[in-house]
Amino acid sequence: MADARRRYSDDVPDDVEDRLRSMCLALPETYEERAWVGTRWMVRRRTFAPVLGVQDAPPGPSVLLAFRSTGDELEVLRNAGHPFFVLGWGRDALGMVLDDRTDWDEVRELVIESYCTMAPKKLAALVEP
């Protein structure tokens, strides 16, 4: 998500962070920590869902969630357009703008898929879709 032209911040609304926290910490062996900017949720020292603010994103400040995806869904999301975008690092890394139109059921599915992509297979097998 790093882009030298952007001003990143920890400015993520509490309700957004709380929703993500609830989703992420419900997954096996996950934990939360402060990232270089924003917050990230991890499994076994691997980040699966960082969230942060971007102050100078067009059309104005935005909140971004990064996640991992695979297979057909990865290709669909790469080409879907707003609110999705390619991060520019990692072949399976995507981002999503979180705003008042966000479909939180979809976010939950994406967070679970990202977790299953990053978690050891034994932990991923414990997750119900």
Predicted stretch roles:
Residues 1-129:
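Charge-dense, helix-prone N-terminal extensions
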